[in-house]
Amino acid sequence: MFTRPLGRTSWQVSEIGYGMWGLAGWSGSDDTESLDSLHRSIALGCNFFDTAWGYGKGHSESILGRVVREHADKTLYVATKIPPKNFKWPSRKGFTLDECFPPEHIREYAEKSLENLGLPHIDLLQFHVWEDDWASDERWQRAMADLKEQGIVRAVGISVNRWEPDNVLKTLKTGLIDVVQVIFNIFDQAPRDRLFPLCEELNIGVIARVPFDEGTLTGTLTKESTWPSTDWRSTYFVPENLESSVDHAEALRPLIPSGMTMPELALRWILADSRVSTIIPGMRKRRNVEANTAVSDGKALDLGLLQQLKAHRWDRTPTAWSQ
């Protein structure tokens, strides 16, 4: 496993990190399987783990904390997120800081997450939604600074709303954000326009999430795919989105090099951008852990292929189903 610097932090994080939403928010979640996959990922060199209080109301955090404590001899980095006070994902323009992240709420959930994790500190604490209109509000700034000074939190980050990579630029310019997490994949290339150049200028770490476009870039979805009503994907892949997503994936298929899978192509495409610090695919099953971590081998995609993949950019705007 290769590592990359996480922005201005002193941390060298694994190119393939571990996204933990699926361990508590999707159908088929199984703690025994999740624990096995987490332990396997560590054995294969993964050292960066991204969770949130919102993933099972702290359940995902508890699973992660247990695993980290069992590997006390290793340097593992834990990232989690504060839910918005109104519990609405994503935030909307017009939402106020008081509705989402008043200072007392920031502290309350930092302490809840710390308790769930059972660790001495949180390496990276992120806001789970964000509106750039809050950039200059000193209340969140002081709240996070206090948590840092008290040793509860080591670094501060923002998880940018889906398909809104520019809705954080003013906040990054405050100099108070160490890491940004954003959707970035073969379809979602917009972060390259303005976000990545700014992150590079300010030495801000970049976490690439949703590398497989919620499953589209695994190449396994069909227009007949369905999910249980309890599975978040059942509300995301409405017919309008599912049909278009499958069409985009099928258009990509002829470009996949011989001997390579679509998920491997998706990960290698992201790694081709040196401004990305780590990718956090969801990995519930051991076989997916092994396949995804194997991509961190230093082998680059052909430049001609990278050029062709630019044409598969798919710009989308938030809708009622894209929470």
Description of each model-found segment:
Residues 1-76:
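N-terminal binding-site loop/beta-alpha segment at the start of enzyme catalytic domains
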Residues 114-133:
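Active-site groove signature of glycoside hydrolases
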